[in-house]
Amino acid sequence: PKMEQVVEYLDAPLDESLNFLDRISNIIDFYFGILELDERLAPFIVNELIMHPGRWDMFRDRFLRNESRSSAFDRFDGMVKEEVAKGTIVPVEAIDLLLNIMSLTISTFIVAPKGFAKDECDSNSRKEYLLRRKENIRDLVINGIRK
């Protein structure tokens, strides 16, 4: 259920008034925001996947089998397919794009520099680091799918 909630949050940044690449940027910003709320969340997620490897398979399978897909993921999948058909982005599976975004985002918090924890680092340094990483990930993902 917890992993399902994470993907249901996908619906929030999919603003219909924005172009597709801006929506991707919103998704990255949104997931960063969730992980910034509690510095224990990223290690918890990674630990859950390591300690319970079957959960990763269940998570991925949930979005590959049509009968059990979430409505948020269906919407995202439709947007990706539409952009591929229009030639705006390179061919990519929606699940792979989403997992790339999620793994790049979470890795920012897992491989952060020593002394990065909120109580070990001044807030400006922390904000600068997170902003730089968010921009780098946004550029990497968008440049990787843009045609």
Residue ranges of predicted features:
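Active-site micro-motifs of SAM-dependent methyltransferase domains
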Residues: Q5, M51, S103, S107
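Amphipathic alpha-helical packing segments from all-alpha helical-bundle domains
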Residues: E4, D22, R55-A85, D96, ...
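Short, flexible helix-adjacent loops and helix caps
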Residues: D11, D15-L18, I50, G54-D57, ...
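C-terminal peripheral helix-coil segments that are non-catalytic and often amphipathic
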Residues: F30-G33, S70, D74-K86, V90, ...
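Amphipathic alpha-helical segments used for helix-helix packing
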Residues: L37-R60, A112-E120
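Hydrophobic alpha-helical connector segments
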Residues: E8-P43, L64, I95-I101, K147
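A short, mixed-charge helix-start or loop-turn motif at secondary-structure junctions
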Residues: Y9-L14, W56-R62, D119-K127
